[in-house]
């Protein structure tokens, strides 16, 4: 018999962590259990959390697993770790959910997941990974798109997730935060369509001493460079930085 209380764990693609291969059903620790309640993030235990805090751990993998505990087992041991997690010497892996699926987040929210945990990490994580439908769902449930200095729009721009950028801006994300961070990094990484959309939304191409064109040039993104020039970016900024660092500019200046 196991506990009726439901916990959760996030696993990676192979569901293997620190050399231990997790399997459906009962998993038993092979090494000695670390029962020191003052120790944190140590070997000697299977880690898991509850529904309220699961969003803090989204970057640990791609699957959500339901966890129940074999509390009727006389050899079962468990301690509460720091930072909203527990560890035990035995856990039971139940249902598996994919973290890129909106239904997973609907399930978690319905089971009490805190959408604002760890400075709205859920929407920040979804923006990094380009999960547009998940983002829309999180926003509709009150997620703060401005958390951590508009982290979501900044990282969606860095990673090249156009649909996410478009949706965040439609909901009021600040494209000018941190000296127009979004267009500077979209330019650096060569995300032309995002650069175009940010400019059409009012991004400042001159921010940080024409950083966008300098970074685009330095990384060889000629189409971004050409577009920025067409919008008036200064290729001579910072003592001709763009020209000095990218030979692609020379033909444009002849």
Which residue ranges define each predicted feature?
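ADP-ribosyltransferase catalytic core
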Residues: 32-97
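Leucine-rich, hydrophobic repeat-scaffold detector
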Residues: 94-117, 125, 129
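ADP-ribose/NAD+-binding catalytic cleft of ART/PARP-like enzymes
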Residues: 1-43, 71
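Conserved ankyrin/ankyrin-like repeat signature
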Residues: 104, 133-134, 164, 193-194, ...
């Amino acid at each position: 018999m196991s506990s009726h209380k439901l916990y959760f764990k996030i696993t990676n693609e192979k569901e293997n962590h620190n050399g231990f291969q997790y399997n459906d059903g009962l998993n038993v620790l092979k090494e000695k259990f670390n029962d020191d309640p003052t120790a944190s993030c140590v070997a000697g235990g299977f880690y898991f959390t509850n529904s309220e805090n699961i969003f803090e751990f989204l970057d640990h993998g791609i699957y959500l697993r339901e966890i129940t505990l074999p509390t009727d087992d006389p050899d079962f041991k468990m301690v509460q770790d720091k930072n909203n997690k527990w560890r035990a010497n035995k856990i039971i892996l139940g249902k598996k959910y994919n973290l890129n699926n909106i239904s997973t987040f609907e399930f978690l929210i319905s089971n009490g997941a805190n959408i604002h945990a760890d400075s709205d990490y859920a929407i920040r994580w979804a923006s990094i990974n380009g999960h547009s439908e998940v983002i829309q769902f999180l926003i509709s449930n009150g997620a703060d798109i401005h958390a951590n200095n508009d982290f979501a729009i900044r990282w969606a721009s860095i990673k090249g997730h156009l649909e996410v950028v478009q949706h965040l801006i439609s909901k009021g994300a600040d494209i000018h935060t941190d000296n127009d961070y979004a267009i500077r990094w979209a330019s650096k990484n060569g995300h032309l369509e995002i650069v175009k959309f940010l400019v059409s939304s009012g991004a400042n191409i001159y921010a940080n001493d024409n950083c966008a064109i300098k970074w685009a040039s330095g990384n060889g993104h000629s189409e971004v460079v050409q577009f920025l020039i067409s919008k008036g970016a200064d290729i001579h900024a910072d003592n001709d930085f763009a020209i000095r660092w990218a030979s692609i500019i020379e033909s444009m200046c002849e």
